[in-house]
Design a protein with these regions (language model features):
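Carbohydrate-active catalytic/glycan-binding domains of CAZyme proteins
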Residues: 1-141
Length: 141
């Protein structure tokens, strides 16, 4: 987990005997770097091998995904090896970043994003917030 004040840089291990609560911070600092500290999804289990997806935040939030192979994990140690980095194609619609990858059975979900410049965005947001209830009534009818 990354702490709120770590700016996506410090990744620590937390341990518990219960999956739902009672986690304690381990003294192990897994990584202290904007490249690969912030998680990009759940751990993946493929052919008895564990992989950890992480974000590349060197140039900003979630510019790409790094996949690490977990070599060793215990209460006292953690070791991983980089397998591959994934970045969006500059000509794709979501060209500004990839920040999530998850698998479930035969389904893979990858989340990307594109920053759009919207002229007068602040004015639009203020008007929308001011008249939100009125607009909602129009949409219902």
């Amino acid at each position: 987990a990354t702490s709120r004040n770590a700016y996506n840089k410090d990744l620590y291990m937390w341990t518990s005997n219960n999956r739902l609560y009672g986690y304690d911070l381990s003294p192990i600092l897994i990584k202290s770097n904007l490249f690969g500290s912030r998680m990009a999804g759940d751990f993946m289990y493929v052919n008895n091998t564990v992989y950890r997806p992480a974000q590349d935040c060197l140039q900003g939030y979630g510019k790409g995904i790094i996949l690490y192979k977990v070599e060793d994990i215990s209460d006292k140690s953690y070791n991983e090896t980089k397998v591959i980095s994934l970045y969006p194609d500059s000509s794709s619609y979501y060209s500004d970043g990839l920040h999530t990858i998850n698998f479930y059975k035969s389904i893979c979900v990858i989340d990307g994003y594109k920053n759009h410049y919207i002229p007068f965005q602040k004015i639009y947001r203020k008007l929308f917030d001011k008249y939100r209830s009125w607009i909602s009534c129009l949409l219902v009818y």
